[in-house]
Amino acid sequence: MNSRNPIHARTRRTVLLASACSALIATVAPAMAQEAPAGAGPEEDDAIIVTGIRETIQNSINTKREETAIVDALSSDDIGDIPAISVGQAIQTITGATTHREKGDASEIALRGLGPFLSNSTFNGRDATNGSGDRSVNFNQFPSELVNNIKIYKTQQASLVEGGVAGTIEIGTLRPLDFGKRRIQAEVKAQYNPYGDRIVGSGGIGWRGTLSYVDQFANDTIGIAIGVQRNDTNNPEETYAASTTWTACRADIVVTNNNCTEYGRDDYGEGHPFYLVPNAYTFRQISETDKRDAIFGAIQWRPSDQFNINLDVQYSDRTFVESRRDLNISEARRSLTNVVYDENGIVQSLSGQSAIESNGSELSRAEEYLGGGLSIEWQPSDRLTLIIDGSYSRTIRVEDERNVRLRTDPTDVNGVRTVFNNMRIPYTYEIAPGSFVPTITIDPRFDLNNHDLFWDDARFRRDQSRRHNKIIAGRFDAGYEMDGFFSKLSAGVRWSEMTFRDYDVRNGDFNLNPPIAEDRRINNLCRNRAFPQTDFLSAADGNAITSWATFDVDCLFREYMGSEDPGALEDKRSPANRDVTERTLAGYIMADYDVDLGSFPVRGNIGVRVVKTDVTSNGLRSEFVLVDNGDGTFRLETTDDFETVTIKSRSTRILPSVNAIFEVAPNTLLRVAGYRAMSRPAPSALGAGRTFTLDDGGSFTNIEDAIDNVRANGSPRLKPLMSWNADAAIEWYPNKDSILSATLYYKQFNGGFQPVVFDEQFVIDGQTVTVPVTQTRNSPDKSRIYGLELTAATRFSFLPKPLDGLGAKVSYNYADSNFENEDVRLGDQFDPVTETVSEGIIPPASLSGYSKHVLSAQAYYEIGPVSLQAIYNYRSKYYQDFVGGNSQLRFVGPSETVDFRASLDLMKGVSLRFEALNIFNEPKATYMPIYGSSRQYHYYGSKYFIGIRARI
């Protein structure tokens, strides 16, 4: 599998998949036509009561048909019937939606092959926060068992909350009075993870339990709904990764016993040969526990026909703890010889020398979400409806990490000279053409599993980061029913205040050099006698490193530092902190129409939304002092004297929109839409802080290196990305189970993103130095994207029993874009003084999250008590930016996943349920800073769930 060419082989397979998709649609269309025999009236069809997957697909088809905008949906009339283990996995079954997977689960959502940056996500119609620093919703927070409808608006209308160039994802929970019946439901699932079974001392077993209750009281004027879930699972991972900073090394200058010569920007354009290397290579084994508690609640009060009051609250508290064991080749730019590279600078093989480190860390993350809102709907007359809504959403994520490093030395811990008589060990790097798995081979004379060889330069760090994201919002909407061409007039205003604050502080670096006798005592005391995992990276063809000497982190901290946890710094101030406030005021007016155009009924809406955004970003500035580490290197630390720098930005955008639906035949709709849309930068990308980075975990040896590593951690003056959009869709609904649709869309972007360098002054050890600081600006570039979206779904009811329980759905999206994102170090760069652009040496990426091909296929079978469903998802390669921006380019390779779900009704109200995720252990492969240059391969295995659900 890993020897395939990631660029060409995957592309050929994509073409084959697209062809298969077209063939399936051609096959399904006649089947649809056969399912509606002449004389079959609606009464006959309505007499059939359907449940399960078929009911969900029917509801989704009906939602799409009835909505005014172009919408795809996944909905169920009952709580807990969304067929997925998480909301993210449920969304990826919707036409045009795909996901980015982390820890084996669906996380960020891309619509029509466009990343989460271009999408907007709301919960019960309100913006939701997250702990990632961007505007995407962490769908893992929301159990699918407590959600009963998901809508994706592909086109905009004036009444929707602004923010979705690609679309808007709306997650909804039920309203208890609208549900209309009492329901008590309990479900318990056991999880088995084969990778977890390979962790020493773990069986790979976890569980999740869900309990929900819905009821109505006081003559159906008061309704309540409450759901709780406990999730206690494990998500072990194994990975190889290069660092996130890559350098172009001059191939015409060979340097030994030092770092390669960097291809400086002043020399760009001179045609020097170069190759691309990272600062470090790391093999990482992760053992993890993951716990989450979630509570959803809603109260609905309808005291009369004129009032409808809804209060809903969501709470999620998730904690996971990771034990990481790293083998780190920390000097990947040093003493490079025999370098073989291609015309793009991608290294195929090289030899190098580096200190080798056995690093260990204990990381814990706690993420708490609290959200909800109060909505009051009043109908003072049959024609007028007034709605006032207030909402609150807050996410707090806190990470604590304790890290320890032990390095190689010319001697072992017993003082015996090694065969190399050098702290740096020879190694080779090789990668076969087309593979994403490099083979790194350490000189065989060095025993990676010998604890005696890892003891020198003991370094201890205690990091804590905290992200606080809060949104307070209110809106007022009014709707008036009318007679004539316009059937309804709507207007409203919305105000919101979003705050994002974070810090990342370090209690360290503690570089300790006790007498070697003390090192020897601690080394022997704190050894892990066995590697924490069996068969490490055995699925990665070509991997040559399967284990290394590891140590107990708690023991090392206790013996070297006197405490297992020195605690976080009390003073959390840092120049890298972010403090962003964004205030939004928006208003809209929209008119719905429903008329006949000749013999064709036509309905739709036309409107305009005006959005005013004010951003205030505060950053701290301080002098820096040099602190000697005692090993010939130094680090930079801030003084206690800080001053605040405030940067403000403002923008006003006008967003017109029009949607029209033509009923060209009783079961055929033609939709057209035109609109202007906007997507705001991530909150973390608006920071005004500055960071001095040490990507390889080393320390500075001179002040010039320190200056070269200063960067902005945001660009407060970034404006929203704007686009003009046009969509046209044809939809055929032959019966309740079937749909055949095709949508063409076009987006014209006004502006892009481009690195820009500003000179800033810093005081370092009493000296004022001028430092070029790279940020991101809105470029004047124009770009576009066009695409085609296809959907086909049907149940094969024309087949003889029992095959008439078969059904299928397939969706495919093709997109083509010429948008450009430049690499912040090696790409084109704008000079604000000369107002010129200096060309880079590597090509740009496209939109973040943009995939040219997205395919989702489902096959299901339901008959009697049995329900089976298989789901296949494919996504072609895409660029994924790092949260916060101002980072180098990162690409994610094509991904394919196959999931399976099954249920068996044991008796009335009781069912046995089974689910398998990522059955074929598809890894995640990433590349930097150009596609094809391997940066990481990441395996997390399959997951299996089996459980029982009971309803009363």
Model-derived features: where do they sit?
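N-terminal periplasmic "start-of-domain" segments of outer-membrane beta-barrel proteins
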Residues: 49-82, 108, 116-119, 126
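Extracytoplasmic beta-strand/coil segments of soluble accessory domains associated
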Residues: 88-127, 154
